[in-house]
From Swiss-Prot:
GO terms for biological process: lipid catabolic process; lipid transport; positive regulation of phospholipid catabolic process. It comes from Saimiri boliviensis boliviensis. Residues 78-101 are annotated as: Lipoprotein lipase cofactor. This is Apolipoprotein C-II. PANTHER family: APOLIPOPROTEIN C-II. The keyword Hydrolase does not apply. GO terms for molecular function: phospholipase activator activity; phospholipase binding. Keywords: Chylomicron, Glycoprotein, HDL, LDL, Lipid degradation, Lipid metabolism, Lipid transport, Secreted, Sialic acid, Signal, Transport, VLDL. It comes from the Eukaryota.
Length: 101
């Protein structure tokens, strides 16, 4: 499936490349307006800001202190467990690399 996906992606990019090469644009003056990159950046910034505002308002509407406390407790317990098991794993790997002395 991976090779089929790569082949399909390659063909799509190839067709798009030929489309771009086959459609010449009329010459425009560079000082006519803001560059395309600037317009895209402003557009993406606007989308990002609206998404942040929507997520923030949704979070504020659904905020429950009890759930927040449970999430914080689960996070602290899980990070403690992960750090413990990471230490054990590191010790095991180091002892395997050193060998028996």
């Amino acid at each position: 499936m991976g090779t089929r996906f790569l082949l399909a992606l390659f063909l799509v990019l190839l067709v798009l490349g030929f489309e771009v090469q086959g459609a010449p644009l009329p010459q425009q003056e560079e000082s006519a307006g803001p560059a395309l990159l600037t317009q895209m950046r402003e557009s993406l910034s606007g989308y990002w800001d609206s998404a942040k505002a929507a997520a923030s308002s949704l979070y504020q509407k659904t905020y429950l202190p009890a759930v927040d406390e449970k999430l914080r407790d689960m996070y602290s317990k899980s990070t403690a467990a992960v750090s413990t098991y990471a230490g054990i794993f590191t010790d095991q790997v180091l002892s395997m690399l050193r060998g028996e002395e």
